[in-house]
């Protein structure tokens, strides 16, 4: 193998359990976003646009959809003999293999992959954030400061700082303290989960961490604190662009809505920084004589005979005559029946919603079964569910994937209820 100055390791094994039914059958990085993409496309495209041509994608939870999406890396120009994209799954490691025990352990298990390229630097990325970033500028900053590790940070609202790993720094950006989700933060500089390490330094710490049976084998909890404690040169690289952890239903919905605001906070139309993804083989979208679309993203293959307002539609969505979709996300190949009204909902892939359905109505009461997941007024329908004609569905309702019309307990699903596979409602 030819030596590489820098390679990327993209951590894409997370379940994303806070996304509820959206990640019941796929990993969080494979979740659809923005009418066209999957979340992982942003980190992969950042690599391409930053001239990083060697990427190892570390998968674990429900990897099939992700593996199929990435393939040999052609959409990102990573179908290469030397370098390119490689899927690194723990279950490929014969009888001695084991599941990744943490983010640091995931990298430790793939030391041999990194060593093949003898890089001077390794950039560790998370596959479940939405942002556009030039990693080569971060690498320049790392070199200028003779750093052992550089951590990309972003200012978050003070009231949210306790949800993140927080970096406390000197004025010049050198890190003197790291606090994981502090109750009383001293800074609002949050880690973005983007790290550049000198590879030989990181490898030493990964090997030592693996030998510590009490370690959680996590970058934030173990590797970074250990390096700081031992006086390694660690620097914070401040990022000023758009960055979102779309790890909750509300954050995911809000980030999609950001794309269709009057002046989009996150611009996907920048020709200088393209986001690449496999393109569906579908015709252009069609708006019929009874159709209307306002302030929405409508992808290829959609057929619109109803009204779509302030919404994001993925490829192949069919909106029947008289139907109305407002403030909603409708994923690929779903069908919305005649005279159906959809308000502030997330509809999964290949869902069939019947005629005369009203969804997202009533009181905004947190979901009874999972109030910590469904509490922002958004109703979520899992993939390939079938919603029967005439159904009235409230807010913060969750409908399991693959539910059939016959499994609905009634045609009136009140706010805060859950319709579970098997016909139960809670």
UniProtKB/Swiss-Prot annotation:
One of its GO terms (molecular function) is ATP binding. Alpha-D-glucose 1-phosphate binds at residues 100, 165, 180-181, 191. One of its GO terms (biological process) is glycogen biosynthetic process. It is an enzyme of class 2 (transferase). It catalyses: alpha-D-glucose 1-phosphate + ATP + H(+) = ADP-alpha-D-glucose + diphosphate. Keywords: ATP-binding, Carbohydrate metabolism, Glycogen biosynthesis, Glycogen metabolism, Nucleotide-binding, Nucleotidyltransferase, Transferase. PROSITE patterns: ADP_GLC_PYROPHOSPH_1, ADP_GLC_PYROPHOSPH_2, ADP_GLC_PYROPHOSPH_3. The keyword Repressor does not apply. Pathway: Glycan biosynthesis; glycogen biosynthesis. InterPro entries: ADP-Glc_PPase, ADP_Glu_pyroP_CS, GlgC_bac, GlmU/GlgC-like_hexapep, NTP_transferase_dom, Nucleotide-diphossugar_trans, Trimer_LpxA-like_sf. Disulfide bonds: none annotated. Homotetramer. Belongs to the bacterial/plant glucose-1-phosphate adenylyltransferase family. Involved in the biosynthesis of ADP-glucose, a building block required for the elongation reactions to produce glycogen. Catalyzes the reaction between ATP and alpha-D-glucose 1-phosphate (G1P) to produce pyrophosphate and ADP-Glc. This is Glucose-1-phosphate adenylyltransferase. The gene is glgC.
